[in-house]
Amino acid sequence: PRVERDWKPSFVLVGADVGRMVINPLSEVQNYEGFVSLDFDRYLFNAEFGHSTFHRDDEFLYEGSGTYYRIGLAKNFAVASKDRSIFTMGLNYARSNFDQTLIFEDSFFGEQSEFTFQDNNAAARWWELTGGIHVNLWENLNMGYVVRLKFLKKTFGDENVEPWDVPGYGRNKKNGTELKNATVGLNYYLSWRFDLREKALSVPRS
């Protein structure tokens, strides 16, 4: 039977990226991220937000911090799941605003000199194709992950400081010069489901 469309929201899903919290102590980049999802019919409206700091000290010093957000729609292919699992594919628009500082040393006429470039108004935007799953663990507690293909990235800011890292996007460079115009990301979430009302799994049309 055909299913009656139901556009009234029935739940809100609120979560945090716990995978990042585990990786942070071992990484030069510190990320903290959360999300809110609202269902309507077979779709989810997603709003994601985060903060990132980075510090790289090798042949040069590069550091900065900033915030980012993503908004988008995803289709839930598991609307008839009795255990309230969610399996989605969707599209996001993402944007980041951040500051960055680059410090390096070079020698001129036998003397070592230090050069500093700073940009407090850097920004970037990109798009994402996503696929994800959330499964129920206990009561309203859920566990899940989202895989992202990030593409069509564009950066804005001081031309003298090409971003090495972009909050929410990741590494902007494959090496010292070559840019990463596309990349893949993975988030591992714990979330809590707030039910707004009961929703029938399927309602046949007469």
Which residues make up each language-model segment?
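Short loop/turn motifs that connect adjacent beta-strands in outer-membrane beta-barrel proteins
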Residues: 2-10, 78-86, 137-143, 196-206
